[in-house]
Every structure is written in structure tokens, then in C-alpha cells.
Design a protein with these regions (language model features):
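Structured, active/binding-site neighborhoods that engage oxygen-rich ligands
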Residues: 1-204
Length: 204
């Protein structure tokens, strides 16, 4: 976040440079952070969540950003149990996420959902809910999910990170999206064990 660097350049302590910002960009580093922690052998539930929240606080220190960060962390970890995305979202009972609305929205054109009902802008919590709409509707098709998200415009980049990580965690990423990545062989997958997933949910 540019404000982080402005504050840091102005002499503020590193951990005090975040601002009260509630944009979905706050969530963009969470999938990579969780994968990195796993790669270093860090799987303690309280450590995972605190690491995520510490990262988000450092740039987007706002209740809506921290709430969405917690929910995304819960969702990504819970998906490792093998349940479908729709089953997992239903079971987690995420605050502000209506399963009834997700069921209704999946029958509508995407622009009626993200554009008319929900804003295409970056502001949380609507942008997180918009990401969940695409992850729910296209739960078994990574390509369809990310392309549908791109087509509605707005802050589709950060929404794409969120919904892409959710669908990829459940079904992986098609080879066509990975071709040409020079460091692919060194990239660990997000594969937290079932026990960690369950413990994290209890901790929250």
C-alpha cells in the first residue's frame, strides 16, 4: 500500500505504518503467505492466523480488512479437508455471507450480481462477497471463474487473487495458466493438513 511506504519514508516505526484501509488488496498476499509458512514447516493454527493478521495490519489496519482476512484464512484452510467449495462455505457460516443469496445469484448474469447488486470497486466487505460469488458459481472450473471475474471489470485483479486461490485450493490450476512460469518447480502448493484446518477453525 502506498500509504505504508509514505509513512515508513516519513520515519514511522515499521509496524505502525499501516492505515485504516478496507480495500480487497489487503487480502492479496494471504495465499502466498500461507503457502510460504507451510513450506517452512509452520502449521500451528494460532501462528498462521496471527501471521496473516499481522501482515494485514501492517498495511490495511481496518476491522473490515481484518475480518475478511480471517474469513479467507479459514476458508483456504478448511478446503484442504476435501469438501467442495460450496459445502465448505456453507459449513463455515462466514459473517455477512448469505448462502441464500449465493444460491440466488448463481442463476443470474454476473454483471447483475457484480455491478448492479454488488459494487465492482475494491471496498470491503462487498468486494470479498463478490469474490465468493464467483468462487461459488464457478466452483469446479478455475478458468471460468477467473475469466468471469475479469469480464465484470472494476478491481478484478485483487478479486481474482482471492477467488483464484479459493478455486485453486480445491481443484488446482489448469496447466494452461502455468505454462511459462520459470520458477514453477520450486513453488509449494497450499496443502495444510486436515488437523491444522480443524484446529484453526476452533481457534477462531
Amino acid at each position: 500500500h502506498r500509504a505504508f511506504f509514505q509513512n515508513y519514508a516519513g520515519g514511522k516505526p515499521l509496524l505502525s505504518c499501516g492505515i485504516k484501509d478496507y480495500h480487497i488488496g489487503a487480502l492479496s498476499m494471504i495465499p502466498g503467505l500461507l503457502a510460504g509458512l507451510e513450506a517452512t514447516g509452520t502449521t500451528e493454527p494460532s501462528t498462521l492466523l496471527e501471521s496473516v493478521l499481522s501482515l494485514v495490519r501492517s498495511t490495511h489496519n481496518h476491522p473490515d480488512s481484518l475480518r475478511a482476512a480471517t474469513d479467507l484464512t479459514r476458508l483456504l484452510c478448511a478446503l484442504t479437508s476435501g469438501d467442495s467449495i460450496q459445502e465448505t462455505i456453507s459449513q463455515l457460516s462466514l459473517p455477512g455471507v448469505s448462502i441464500k443469496k449465493l444460491l440466488k445469484w448463481e442463476k443470474l448474469e454476473d454483471r447483475r450480481v457484480v455491478g448492479d447488486t454488488l459494487s465492482t470497486a475494491c471496498y470491503l466487505p462487498e468486494s470479498f462477497l463478490a469474490s465468493l460469488h464467483f468462487a461459488w458459481k464457478y466452483h469446479d472450473d478455475f478458468s471460468a471463474a477467473v475469466l468471469a471475474n475479469a469480464r465484470v471489470g472494476g478491481d478484478n485483479c485483487h478479486r481474482g487473487v482471492v477467488l483464484g486461490s479459493i478455486v485453486a485450493c480445491s481443484h488446482g490450476v489448469p496447466e494452461q495458466w502455468l505454462e511459462g512460469l520459470s520458477a514453477l518447480s520450486t513453488m509449494p502448493s497450499l496443502n495444510l493438513c486436515d488437523t491444522v484446518s480443524q484446529d484453526l477453525n476452533r481457534a477462531i
